[in-house]
From Swiss-Prot:
Transmembrane parts of this sequence: 275-295, 302-321, 334-358, 451-471
Any one GO cellular component localisation term in the record: chloride channel complex
Ranges where the record places region Insertion, similar to human gamma-2 sequence which is proposed to be caused by alternative splicing: 376-383
Known function: Gamma subunit of the heteropentameric ligand-gated chloride channel gated by gamma-aminobutyric acid (GABA), a major inhibitory neurotransmitter in the brain. GABA-gated chloride channels, also named GABA(A) receptors (GABAAR), consist of five subunits arranged around a central pore and contain GABA active binding site(s) located at the alpha and beta subunit interface(s). When activated by GABA, GABAARs selectively allow the flow of chloride anions across the cell membrane down their electrochemical gradient.
Domain characteristics, as noted in the entry: The extracellular domain contributes to synaptic contact formation. GABAARs subunits share a common topological structure: a peptide sequence made up of a long extracellular N-terminal, four transmembrane domains, intracellular or cytoplasmic domain located between the third and the fourth transmembrane domains.
Name of protein: Gamma-aminobutyric acid receptor subunit gamma-2
Amino acid sequence: MTPSNPTRLGSTALLNPAFSLKMMVWALVFLSLIQCSTQKGDDDYEDYTSNKTWVLTPKVHESDVTLILNGLLEGYDNKLRPDIGVKPTVIHTDMYVNSIGPVNAINMEYTIDIFFAQTWYDRRLKFNSTIKVLRLNSNMVGKIWIPDTFFRNSKKADAHWITTPNRMLRIWNDGRVLYTLRLTIDAECQLQLHNFPMDAHSCPLEFSSYGYPREEIIYQWKRSSVEVGDTRSWRLYQFSFTGLRNTTEVVKTTSGDYVVMSVYFNLSRRMGYFTIQTYIPCTLIVVLSWVSFWINKDAVPARTSLGITTVLTMTTLSTIARKSLPKVSYVTAMDLFVSVCFIFVFSALVEYGTLHYFVSNRKPSKDKDKKKKNPLLRMFSFKAPTIDIRPRSATIQMNNATHLQERDEEYGYECLDGKDCASFFCCFEDCRTGAWRHGRIHIRIAKMDSYARIFFPTAFCLFNLVYWVSYLYL
């Protein structure tokens, strides 16, 4: 038997019409499979540009998300917290401070704008899908359980609703839930104004659960510190932001022990406004009151009007300074400064009143009256220890001693037991009516203005030195 040629057999098979048709069918089937595979790949992946790099990511179908949400909410009771009766729900909190201010010292409150975030695990919201996280808006908030967090020292709080409610909800496939919202809060801050306006304060923002005690809900900080925005845009005006700190504590009440989270914002007051409005004007008024010491003591209208004007001005300044403060019962640093300035101004007016009283109410000398009545006494007046007042000068004889004094330093107090009381004012009431006693303290009337020119500025400078060192450095 002659063996067949393989090449001839292959050629014969190719020429067979049935075999050719069979090969064409297989080729069409193969091409169809390739086309279907390509279309399926295009449907399951979509292209997006990120930094000019093409990446293929899975498409999320709207129907898939709807099915997941419907499955999660089926039989879900939003009135019950996660793990109820098993273990406490741990709430991880975080805060971003958008702005602080203004601070209202009269009402003792401040305004703060924050983004508040809470994260917890709810096993009832676990789902199996290629979608790792569901990014939802505020419409889903009312359908799941949300912590009943409230701000304990809040006087007023507003949630932002423009253009839509500023709330966000995220649900991960492992049951983790993130809930954030934006709030503007008017919080209470008890200001201690003893050192006003050189005071510093630590204003708290406290929050906790309203109805769940520590056995039900535990709050924890997600990060060790709270993040803040650009402080240059904050409307603090009279204050400077110096830092913050966050704490966790347990507060015991009649309804249970609650975990309270607190953020303390440290603020220090700027003195520029009060220096211009109060301190400098008060200092200038005090200095202005010293001008009367250089005015002639006989210029009664000038010195009196100057003293009264400065006193009234100080009263007005003290009233204006108090308008920016609450009606506290204790004395502030500014009250002390204004009060001392008022005392200095009032003392300057009292000094002139004292001087004018003893100058204008001088008594004529008895020896002088006798000389006017008896011409013989005037002729032999050099033999007796009397006072002889002349138009330009006066000769005072004390114990056979002669002293020449100017006319403007003479006053008509009579001498006691031969002593010269005419040029002195005794600090004791019985000086002009009683006997002379050795060791009395005397103040020279004519030199009161001279003494005041030195005493008042020196005392005021010493007060300022002690005042500023005590409040700024101690």
